[in-house]
Amino acid sequence: MFFAVDAAIGGGISIADETADGNLMVKPFKLALAQSPGELAGPRARVDWLAATLSGIAKQKADLLVLPEMFLSGYYIGDAVHDRAEAADGPFAREIAALAARFGIAVLYGFAERADGLIYSAAQCFGPDGARLGGHRKLAIPPGFETGTYTAGAGCRLFELGGVKIAILICYDSEFTEPMRHVAGLGAELVAVPTALSAEWDWVARTMLPTRAYENGLFLAYANHAGHENGLDYLGASFIAAPDGRELARAGSGPEVLLAEIDPARVAAARARLPYLKDRKGLKLDAG
């Protein structure tokens, strides 16, 4: 095994194997998504659950595990969020970073971030060496209990893992066309969407978000909770979608781990076949 440059993914460095005939075979990027139980208690129980889950998927050689919105703290927890919020480098964050390094799997998870006296609905990713690769603060705060509790974030950034360019959007962010289109324009090939979607919003997970993958020509990992939390019924229905909008994996309503191999070359192929991102620039929207 050795390192080779893969032109199909924009010159990024990928681990490649040599086949019997001497050709290069790029190591596939294996994506895991965990639909975690909503009934889990506080951060301690959730980190313990994560450790057990990572132990299981390590056997599958996963490169990245995506977890739901507010995985660490719990989502529908009322005023308890003030006690469970922590800094991006807080004690539980350090434990999660250590787990990522222990199992050699990048971990992307949602949490309540405390910074400068404010609380954000945030997500961050630790790489397989435990180093922080990137993070995101929820841009759009929906009506309801989140308003007045969380401060809206600003900006979207990409990070790279295994030759794949990754962006994070959180739940409601992804329901607007603009953020998804923005990160696609930045070059995102995979968008991770930690979410906390209740059962009444079924069509968002089954129709709207696969369409976001299709219209932007990218992979999309939508990670929801399962079961119940303090009277809130989660939909489940987490999924991984390809750049053509097709489902690579779809969860039911209970706790589940999804696995899919993603090939960034499919992003370029999808965007060439239906060049929405390029052709939209020529649209004349003003009448004058």
For each predicted feature, which ranges?
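CN hydrolase (nitrilase-like) catalytic-core segments centered on the catalytic cysteine
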Residues: 88-108, 175-258
